[in-house]
Amino acid sequence: MANCEGTDGDGSGCNGWFLVQAIVDKQTGDTVSEDEDENATDTGSDLADFIDDTTDICVQAERETAQVLYNMQEAQRDAQSVRALKRKYGGSNLNKSPCAKPPGVHREQRVTLQELPVNICNKQARTNVYSVPDSGYGNMEVETAEVEVTVVNNTNGEEEGENGGENGGSIREECSSVDSAIDSENQDPQSPTAQLKTVLQANNQKAILLSQFKHTYGLAFNDLVRTFKSDKTICTDWVAAICGVNPTIAEGFKTLIQPYALYTHIQCLDTKYGVYILLLIRYKCGKNRITVGKGLSKLLHVPESCMLIEPPKLRSPVAALYWYRTGMSNISEVSGTTPEWIQRLTVIQHGIDDSVFDLSDMVQWAFDNDVTEDSDIAYGYALLADSNSNAAAFLKSNCQAKYVRDCATMCRHYKRAQKKQMTMAQWIRFRCDKCDDGGDWRPIVQFLRYQGVEFITFLCAFKEFLKGTPKKNCIVIQGPPNTGKSYFCMSLMHFLQGTVISYVNSTSHFWLEPLADAKVAMLDDATGTCWSYFDTYMRNALDGNPISLDRKHRHLIQIKCPPILITSNTNPVEENRWPYLTSRLTVFTFPNAFPFDQNRNPVYTINNKNWKSFFQKTWCKLDLQQDEDEGDNDGNTIPTFKCVTGENTRTL
């Protein structure tokens, strides 16, 4: 016979059948006991207490009792700690809270809460407790009382019969003792919190803070700072005076501020308002007054109304000396690198150098950097104040505008005299020294050949042009529009630093005044009217002979007209209207349009580097080598200009 599924066989293993034999002692006809009911149904209720679980229930009850007692004690301690902390750090804002009530109301509420029974579970009473307004700082006693009542209600449970009265009594006694201590502190007018409340309630808080700062530190706060009218002005260095700081927080503040700053100088002195902190800080990035105030308020738990925040004085030796001297004393905690403005104002040599301004040093700087405009001189020299003591003294002076005008005037005088003493060859050499190397002369020659100009012919005319030979003192580049006439001539003027005159100013008597200080001049796009003016008034100028110039607010001056380069769409030689200009002009024609590549870049690049290479290549052809043997001991054809006293170089 096959085995049944899921079994190990009949009578084998643990799944087999077993026989149960019941032994019945009672037989039919025996007398039934009185405490037995024959008609009763067997419900199994007689087995309810079959297992003895009294031991487990007792153990569980003991554990719950201990846990409830522990929770109650912890809640007591937490409530006392919260009350003490709120009293310390939040008491100053109690009266300023919009939800705060007069002190009498709080005392009445505290009395009412103390009179409540500990086992209170009335919904109406609990609603009254929760309805007390809170601003976040005030009403600390009400909050703690509410916490204690709730804890007792949750923890008493079944045990309030025996221990409820004792626990409730102890809680009420502790609450009463703490509240009485708080009331006594509130009533003490000499406590730091009460003193700080007077500051917060004052009409002019800043005046009280300034007065207390001077009384504490012995100097005025404004002696160390300069005023920023806007709260949004950004600065990296700030000075802050914080009043009413808790001593414990003030001690930890020295460590908490380190991640935000590159330099800190902290002083802490005790006052009747609490700890008064004086802080000089350099942040890692620029911040405005609002950001600084929020950051310090978060670290110190002090409202921003108890702070004075301004940037330090960066040019006051007295302020810098105060930070320097107090930084070496034991009342200050200093960390980081000392700011450069403190070092500059406290080092003796720097103080001596900064006190004297030398105009010649400023003129020498402007001359060496070829700066002659007033605005450029003022801005450029002011940027050197961090590294140049004379520039720092210039910024301290009240006569900056006068110094700038005098410097620009003297620099122009020196530049004009230097240019006047140079020959054309020296001037070209001087301009070549100002340019970088790496140019190529070939694009210039290729462009002339592209326009059909013979290079040798142009070179001969250009040599006479640079020498200022009479009747050869003017070169005209004429041709159709867009042939590169202005591009070619303007690049040459830029390299030689020539002067450009415009016929649009011809109605003025002074439109030719720039020719007085020029080595080379240019007039762009001369029209028929302009050629008529030249034919009438400027024949001597085109000849290269001396002419008389009228200058504004000055006497007439007699000069030899510099070489003039003119561009025009009209060929004056072919016109019969100006027969007297034919012998005075050397004309080159550019007939072809200027070429560009596919990217609209010039095919022939003409710049300062290429012109330098061109002059170096054709130096002998242009007959410019006559001044090479003339020079100073250093081999320079141009003497070095110095308007300051030289310094002896110390040899090692």
From Swiss-Prot:
Residues 153-173 are annotated as: Disordered. GO terms for biological process: DNA replication. It comes from Human papillomavirus type 70. Its main location: host cell. Phosphorylated. Sumoylated. Residues 453-603 form the SF3 helicase domain. Keywords: ATP-binding, DNA replication, DNA-binding, Early protein, Helicase, Host nucleus, Hydrolase, Isomerase, Isopeptide bond, Nucleotide-binding, Phosphoprotein, Ubl conjugation. This is Replication protein E1. Its EC number is 5.6.2.4. It catalyses: Couples ATP hydrolysis with the unwinding of duplex DNA by translocating in the 3'-5' direction; ATP + H2O = ADP + phosphate + H(+). The gene is E1. Belongs to the papillomaviridae E1 protein family. GO terms for molecular function: ATP binding; ATP hydrolysis activity; DNA binding; DNA helicase activity. It is an enzyme of class 5 (isomerase).
